[in-house]
Structures are given as structure tokens and as C-alpha cells.
A protein has these predicted regions:
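Hydrophobic alpha-helical connector segments
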Residues: 82-110, 286-313
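Amphipathic alpha-helical segments used for helix-helix packing
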Residues: 103-128, 166, 309-329, 369, ...
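Alpha-helical DNA-contacting segments of helix-turn-helix folds
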Residues: 59, 67-73, 269-276, 319
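Hydrophobic/aromatic-rich alpha-helical bundle segments in the mid-to-C-terminal region
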Residues: 149-215, 352-398
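Amphipathic alpha-helical packing segments from all-alpha helical-bundle domains
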Residues: 126-150, 159-160, 187, 329-353, ...
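Conserved small-residue-rich
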Residues: 166, 170, 212-280, 284, ...
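Helix-turn-helix
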Residues: 22, 26, 30-66, 233, ...
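N-terminal positioning helix adjacent to the helix-turn-helix/winged-helix DNA-binding module
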Residues: 19, 26, 161, 222, ...
Length: 408
């Protein structure tokens, strides 16, 4: 009897002390990998090893769980930079410490850090404001030492520098390229310092706006118009929140007319992203015809990539925010096209900077491309239109600094 009682006691399962932390980590990783709408409470509960009813005892709804996960990530950025408010070191030392702290937090959350970057649109009004407050506080903490180190920077330039620094560091959550932790930390640190040291152009200067092109030509027919309208709606509302009726209305056709061209909404997303990636890749390759100097070739690619992204802001953002809604096969096809583009840039960068390994060069290319979206959103590139020459020049300069490692 004593033995039986002991055996019964041995199988009693006690709740781990870090259950809340387990739930927070599992939910953040799930939402980041699959998107808000695709994740279920049951899936998160299973990942933690509890039942869905048990999970509901911690969080009243999926939205509550999502909100807590997003704001917890933002709070980690706030907490790791708290010291800057009372730091009495030299501004350069404070900036170095800020960079190191932000890199450490980002690497610790590499599986989930994309959540606040790409899924935060699903936060409700007050929660969206709370996240915005967190990120503004972190940016201002970065800008404070910059005001002393670089007193001639204007406020918009400081914001581009701090946002660019956060973008370069945060870009590591958007891919799975592996390096030893110390090596990737040093690489991101050097890139972040180059970005905040970049000599940004002055707005009163005259800038030649590089030629740009729309990836989808709506004047060529309903097919292209459907792709263009769909991408704009997916970017504005999110793929899951966009209906076929809204797409049809934007193009001026009945809903039934869409099915002459696409079997369903997922096919529109897959076709739009894949076709855009193919066309951008082909366009960029054509620019390099007959050229041989890798540094010059990369500079031309940067110019064309920025101009194309500003002319097609919906597509630049959707690649990051909505690809989780593709089927696994379509995700792999899209990754293959993107990988080919990244590889082409990587080879040029490795040739231009022989001290870099190919893996290091690949990470820097990802960082440079992330700048276009992150800083582009800061300057509202979707609304820039004919006034985009100056912000484009700034983004090009930040990309130059990231890739070539120079602030000037």
C-alpha cells in the first residue's frame, strides 16, 4: 500500500514555475512564424503541454495572448535600454552599450522578434499606441547620445539614423542564416555603427530621382489590375481581412469575374509575390549587363532596388507581412527566388569586400534590404510620390553604410 501510494505520488505533475514564460515564448514564436490569424489557442496549448481550457485560465482570448506577446517583446527593448536614462558615461560609450544591449535582446528573441515588426498591425487602437510609445522611447534613447556625437543632424535625420540602426539589428529575425553568436554580434554591431555614422544628405540639396517602374501595369488588362489592387488591399488591411468582394470592387468587376483568372485568394497572393520577385530579379539583372566592377554594380543595384521599392511600397512590405499565408509549396518557391536575388548581391559584396565571408555578406544584404521597408515606413514611402527623391537618397546612403561599412 505504501509502495502504491509512493508510485501515485511519483506521477503527480506539478505546474512549472515558469509556465507564464513558457506560454509567452511559445505564443510569440507561433504568431511570428504563422501569423496572427493562422494560430489557434489549441496549437499554443499543445506546444506548452497543457490543455486549451488551461490556457484560457491565463488569457481570456487569442487576442489577449497576442497583445501580451507583442507588447512583451517591445518591453524587452525598453528594459534593455533603461540604463541610458541615467547613464553618465561618454555619449559614445552609451551608444555602444545601447547597440550591444539591443543586439543581445534581438538574438535572444530571434524566433519571435518578427512579431512586433510584421504582425503588430493586428493590435487594437490603444495597444497599437502602447507599442508605438515603446518604440519611440527606444528611438529617443538612441538619439540622445547622437545629439552630442553628431550635433548637426536634424530631427528627421536622427530619426532615420535610430530607425536604421534598429532595422539593421532587427533584420536578423527575418532569416535563418547562421553564424557563431560572437561573430554575428560583431557584424551587426559594425553595421549599426556605420548606419548611425552615415552622412545623410540635406533636404535642401537637389536630388535626381532614379527612374522607377510599376511592377504591375494596370492598363494592360484585368489580370494585372487584379494583382495590383489585391496587393494594395493586402498591405492596407492584411490578407486574412481582405475579401474577394473588396478586390472585385477595387477593379470594377463582379466577384465571379475574379475566378476567370484565379482559383482563389491564396492564388492571387502567391502569383503576386512570385511574379513581383521574378520581375524585380530580371530588372536588376538587366541593369548589370556589361559591367564588371562589383562595388559599382552593387551601388547601381541599391539605386534601382530603392526606386522600385518606393514605386511599389505594397509589395516591399507584403513580402515580410503576408508570406506566412502562402501554402508551404508557394513559400518555398518564393524563398527560392528571393534566395537567388540575395545570393547575387552577396557575391558582389563579397567581391567588393574580400575580408567578408559569404555568410557575413549574406547577413549584411538581408540587413540592407530590411532598411528599405523599415525606414521607408518611417518616411511614409507609400505617400511620397513625386517627393520621394530625398528619402530615397537617405535610404540609399544607409544601405551603402550597411553594405560597405562606412558612415561617410
Amino acid at each position: 500500500m505504501t509502495t502504491a501510494r509512493a508510485q501515485g505520488a511519483a506521477v503527480v505533475r506539478r505546474r512549472p514555475k515558469d509556465r507564464k514564460d513558457q506560454i509567452a515564448r511559445a505564443s510569440a514564436e507561433a504568431f511570428s512564424a504563422q501569423g496572427y490569424h493562422a494560430v489557434s489557442m489549441e496549437a499554443i496549448a499543445a506546444k506548452v503541454g497543457i490543455s486549451a481550457p488551461a490556457l484560457y485560465r491565463h488569457h481570456a482570448s487569442k487576442y489577449d495572448l497576442f497583445r501580451d506577446a507583442v507588447l512583451a517583446l517591445g518591453q524587452q527593448l525598453v528594459d534593455c535600454t533603461d540604463f541610458a536614462d541615467t547613464d553618465d558615461r561618454e555619449p559614445g560609450e552609451t551608444l555602444d552599450r545601447l547597440i550591444d544591449a539591443l543586439i543581445d535582446v534581438t538574438l535572444a528573441n530571434r524566433e519571435s522578434g518578427g512579431l512586433y515588426r510584421w504582425q503588430a498591425r493586428y493590435l487594437h487602437g490603444d495597444d497599437q499606441s502602447a507599442l508605438g510609445d515603446q518604440l519611440r522611447l527606444v528611438n529617443r534613447r538612441i538619439q540622445r547620445p547622437l545629439m552630442v556625437i553628431r550635433p548637426t543632424l536634424t530631427s528627421p535625420q536622427r530619426w532615420m539614423a535610430s530607425a536604421g540602426m534598429l532595422s539593421v539589428i532587427g533584420s536578423v529575425v527575418d532569416h535563418r542564416v547562421q553564424l557563431p553568436t560572437d561573430e554575428i554580434r560583431a557584424l551587426l554591431r559594425a553595421a549599426a555603427l556605420a548606419v548611425v555614422g552615415a552622412e545623410l544628405p540635406e533636404p535642401e540639396h537637389t536630388f535626381e530621382r532614379p527612374s522607377s517602374w510599376r511592377i504591375f501595369e494596370v492598363d494592360t488588362g484585368v489580370y494585372e489590375a487584379l494583382l495590383q489592387a489585391s496587393m494594395a488591399l493586402f498591405n492596407a488591411k492584411g490578407y486574412p481581412e481582405t475579401s474577394m468582394a473588396e478586390i472585385a470592387s477595387a477593379v470594377g468587376i463582379p466577384v465571379s469575374g475574379i475566378y476567370r483568372y484565379f482559383p482563389g485568394k491564396c492564388d492571387i497572393l502567391a502569383t503576386g509575390l512570385r511574379r513581383a520577385a521574378d520581375r524585380v530579379s530580371g530588372r536588376l539583372s538587366a541593369i548589370l549587363t556589361g559591367l564588371t566592377e562589383p562595388g559599382h554594380m552593387l551601388t547601381l543595384l541599391i539605386e534601382a532596388y530603392v526606386a522600385t521599392s518606393f514605386a511599389n511600397p505594397d509589395l516591399a512590405a507584403i513580402y515580410y507581412t503576408e508570406r506566412v499565408n502562402l501554402t508551404r509549396v508557394d513559400q518555398e518557391l518564393l524563398r527560392a527566388v528571393q534566395r537567388s536575388t540575395i545570393d547575387a548581391w552577396m557575391r558582389l559584396l563579397a567581391a567588393a569586400r574580400p575580408a567578408l565571408t559569404e555568410t557575413q555578406a549574406r547577413i549584411l544584404v538581408h540587413a540592407a534590404m530590411a532598411l528599405v521597408v523599415d525606414v521607408g515606413r518611417l518616411v511614409h514611402y507609400e505617400d511620397a510620390g513625386d517627393n520621394s527623391a530625398y528619402p530615397q537618397a537617405c535610404v540609399r546612403k544607409l544601405m551603402d553604410a550597411t553594405l560597405f561599412g562606412t558612415g561617410g
